[in-house]
Structure formats: C-alpha cells, structure tokens
C-alpha cells in the first residue's frame, strides 16, 4: 500500500516550507528515518526523514517549490507498485495500517563490530560525511604505512565544506598502503588506504618506499620510520611543551597523565589529558622514544610553551638531569648523530650556503610569516633545514604541503631573492580557506540570508539599547578550578564558565519575569512566559545558530553543561531538529570567545533581551574589605545586556543585571555542582 509523505510542521507559527534539495529520486529505496529531502523555512534548514520504508513511487513537489504544512510532497510504496504511479492517491487514506508492517520489515540488527583485517587487505574508502557531500580533502594522515591500528582508531583527518573530522579505521590490522596524499581531494567511496595483517604489509611497504629518494635510508632500517616528518627522539631528550590550545588560551591544567616515566611512546600517541576553559583534549607525543622525565604533575596549571616532559631513547632515561644542563648543545648532535640519516642529508645544507637563502636555511621558530602548516610539515622542514618563510605553498589557500618542503630541500625552489625580508602578517585566527573568497561574488547560504533579514527587521520593530555591568568572576574561577577534575569524572563533561553564566541568568529571569516576556504591538498585550527557554548562540561553519535549552529553570549545572555541549555539537554537525530552534524567550551569546571585552548584541523579537558574556581577563581592581580599600588582581568580565525598551525599562534592566552580578560574585554554586 502506498503512503503519502506530507510537509511536516517545522516549528511554531511555521505554515510552509521550501524544498531546497531532494536527496532521493523516484525508484530509490529508502529506510525508516532515512533523509528524503532538505527543506528551508524562515526559522530553520533541516532534513526531512522518510516516515516509512519502501520505494519512492512519485515526487509531487520540485526543488524550490514552497509547500504548505500538510501538503503531499511524495508517495512511497512497495517495489511492485512502482509502475502504478497513478494509484497512490486512492491508497493514501490508510496510512495507519501500513505503518506497522513497514516498520517491522526494515529493522536491521546493529552492525557487528568490524573484524580484524586478514592477510587479504581491506579497502578503506572515503566515507559519506553528510547529505549532499560528494568529496573530502585529506588534511592530515595520523598513521603511516606499517603502523598497526585498532578498530575505530583515528586514521586521518578529512575536511569538507560542512565538517572537519577524523576518519576511524574500519578494521584492526596493519596499514599496508596509502593511496591518497595529504591535500588530495577524494570522491566519496574512493579507496584511500588498505589495511591487512603484518604479512600483507610486506609487499606494499616496499612499493611506497620509492616516492622520495631521501627517505629510503630512513625506511630501510626501522619500519616505524614511515612518517619521516616526526623523527624518533635520540639519546638527547626532546622537550614536550604545553601547546597552544586555542585563541586567548594562555595556560592548561593537566588532568591526567596517560604515560609514566620509562614508558615507550610512538609519534602522535596520547601522552596526557589537558583541560582549559575552552576545551578538554589529549596531547600527543611529538616524537617516538622513552619518557625520561615528567616535569608537571596532575592538576598542575601550566603556561603555554612551558616544558612538561622530556622524551629520549632508553639510554637517555638514565641521566635526564645531565641533559637539561646544556640544551643548546644537545640540538646539534640530534641532527648530526642519528645513524639512520646518511651524510647525504647534510649536503643540501652545504650547497645552500653558496646561495642567499642559506642564511635563513633553518625553520622559523615562530612561524608567524607562514600562512598555515601542519605540525608534521613543520617537523619535516626542520629535519631538512628548510626555512618555511621561503617556501611558496601549492595547497588550498596557499597552504604549504609536504611536497613543497621536499621540493625546497632538493633545491627546486630556491630563488635568489628568497632571503629578502618578508612582511610579518599575523596568522592568528586566520582561516586559510577564506583566501579563495577574495575577488569573488557568491550567493549567500540560507543561514546568512535569514540572519541578515532577521537582524535588520529586529532593529526596525524593537526599541533596542544596551546596558553594561562589570562582574568580578574571581570566586567562580577558583571554585571552577577546584572542582573541574571531580566534575569531569562524575558528569563526563568539562566545567566551563558558561554553565555558571546560564545558571545565574536563568534564576534572574525567574526572579524578574518582566524580562522573560514578549510584547505584541498589534494586540497591545504582554506575555510573561512561565518557562525559561534559553537560546544559546553557536558559531558554526555555516553561520550563527541559536538552539534552545527548553525549561532551563529546571536544570542543574551538570545538566546545563551537557545541554550546551549537545546543542553545540549538533549545530556544527547539521543535526538540529526544528524544535531545537524554536520557542526561545531569552538569549546568551559568548562574545568573549575571541577575546572581545564587550559588544552590543542584537535581540530578535519576540524575545525582549540578549546577554553577552565578554572575555574574562585579569586586571588590577580596587576592592573594599572591612572598610579598607586595596588594589588586587581580579578576574573581571563585562556583561552587556541588550533589551527592548517596549518591554523593559532601564531601571528594570539594571535590577536584572544586579541580580546576575550578585549571584556570580557570591559564587555559592557548590550545591549546584552535584558532586
């Protein structure tokens, strides 16, 4: 029996939707909940799933058609009904009887765990990374030929126009062949690597040994040297530093060491877990070797760039203290002593000495003049003595690739004027992908179109003004630092500042219902909402989205933290549902993520307010205790509140902000952490 697929209700007050793209065609077989098409409204862009399993018999609305909610857009039936495209109209009235058998048929057992690869190599294909995504660009291989991988262990990083993600291994085994290089753009379904067992690795490994003549001596002795960009540590220990983990992040807290002194590690094998106020992440080993010293303990907060460990070989473990005494002298033997490297690699340096470029034939330590390079490319450049400032990248957006470094090392790209001073443009917060936008005119996406329309409209129909309060976050910062490890262990989510802001704002909205309100100019009525449905602004590659935490007044801080992470993740991966973007009564936007101290956020009616949270910065402040003034270093933040004067008066806005300020400065959140 055929089933009519109707345009669903995609949010409050939404009466129609525009079909932007059909993901299936007539004759295609679909499963229950498999995406059929993409629909756009003035509130959301979303995929419409199939309500039943079967074959698409007829499509009744074309792309770019605007269809009323409840309008029939397609007919789905059985395969033997395909020729009878005229029949579905009579069969549509009885969907209830169809749904039971239809939903029972397609149910499939969960896919069994991927088996280990056998001697016959298993193909690793470029996966489908989203609807309408047909290709992906390999940004970095995390493994090399000869490496052993487990099921679901990350193999490589891939970038598309919708998402950057890691691709896991479908099987356990040994990588016997890599068929696509970094920066290659590969079609979905194309084979990018092969995984087999150790025996299967023997033959392909020899085939891959030929591309770069310089790498042959390295690959002949240990098979671990498949990734020449990251050399193994030698007898002289290599410093492991606290990396820069985001813009404006100056320090990180070590939450857990995953390795101990004496442990052997491979390149990119996780060493420790680090937490900042923006991210929790694992820090990989920059070299292969043995951990000879750990210089920072768990729960220590360490500045970016500080040495936290040292890695050498087994011999280096015996006397790490002696190696520390002369780090400058160690660096020379590291490059000259390794037996794995033939003298052949020192010759290019001598030749370079006869050219103007030789004066700068070392890697720029800061890399500020370089558009963008991966850590592996930077290590390769250091190994071959190539100054990245003199290399012209051939990758996307001028990105320097491995091939560019090798070409420069071979003297293929060494112009006489390379040593000339280069303008030190900043690369902080620069997305090299955006370089291709220069000099072009492009149609905006749906999110940008809606944002442009709604923000201009909001300024025309509401009386917006902004009030700014300053809040001392020192006590919250101390409470957060003290409880972060226990919070992560118990609740499985990082404790950032945002849940504290959300908790304080939600409580203030309950206490000040005149701010959690909406004004109807036509009926001259004010609605005071019973629930606090808090919109959270999320920066996504496609643009700004504001998903909603419904009934936020009923949530604890752990529940708020989990809701924020969930909504942000689904926003960036195009997984939001229509209800996630509707019903908001107030908005919070984190304007401080890139260091902004303040802003004037734009509210979108029917909401009456939006609160910005600026960057939390340490600065000297006059404080008064027991009637005595003193100057102290405090962690301060600005909270700009934009509100609609049709709904809220200035004095009421001030009282609302004062309530938030008092809650945050008092910082009595211990009971709210549920530890």
Swiss-Prot record:
Residues 372-409 form the Peripheral subunit-binding (PSBD) domain. CDD domains: lipoyl_domain. The modification N6-lipoyllysine is found at residues 43, 162, 278. It is an enzyme of class 2 (transferase). Residues 77-124, 200-240, 316-368 are annotated as: Disordered. Binds 3 lipoyl cofactors covalently. GO terms for molecular function: dihydrolipoyllysine-residue acetyltransferase activity; lipoic acid binding. Is the only lipoylated protein in C.glutamicum. Forms a 24-polypeptide structural core with octahedral symmetry. Part of an unusual ODH/PDH supercomplex, consisting of AceE (E1), AceF (E2), and Lpd (E3) together with OdhA (E1+E2). This is Dihydrolipoyllysine-residue acetyltransferase component of pyruvate dehydrogenase complex. It comes from Corynebacterium glutamicum (strain ATCC 13032 / DSM 20300 / JCM 1318 / BCRC 11384 / CCUG 27702 / LMG 3730 / NBRC 12168 / NCIMB 10025 / NRRL B-2784 / 534).
